Amino acid sequence: MGQLIDSSVHSSLVFEVNGKVVTDSLVIAKIFKKNHFDVLKEVRKQIVYVGEEFGGENFHESTYFNSKNRRIPKYDLTEEAFTLLVMGYTTREAVGMKIKFMKEFKRMKQYIQNQQNVPKDP
C-alpha cells in the first residue's frame, strides 16, 4: 500500500501514500462487495471521463502481489476520486459505507495536518 502512519491512526479504509490520503481499488471492492476486476473497469472508465488533469491528480495506478505471487494492477484513489467512483453506489449499505469512508478521510487528513504542525526538536 503506502507508508502507514502509526498503528493507532491507521485505518483499514484510508491511508497515506506520498503525503496524500487515499484508499485503493482493493479496499473499495472488499467493502462494497464488488469484484475487483469490475472496480478496475469502473475506475478506468472514470479516468477517461474526467480527463488527464483530474485523473492524473486523483487516480494513481499501482500493483500488488496476489496469493499466487502474481503482480496485479490496482489504483490508489484520493477522496475526490473515491467520491466520484462510488457516487452511483446507492444501496442502504453502500450509503453507510460512504459515510464511514468520508469520516476516515477527514480523520486521516486532520492527523497529517497535526503532524505537520508539531514542532521538531532542535
Name every feature range the model reports, one short phrase each.
Residues M1-K120:
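An anion-engaging/catalytic patch
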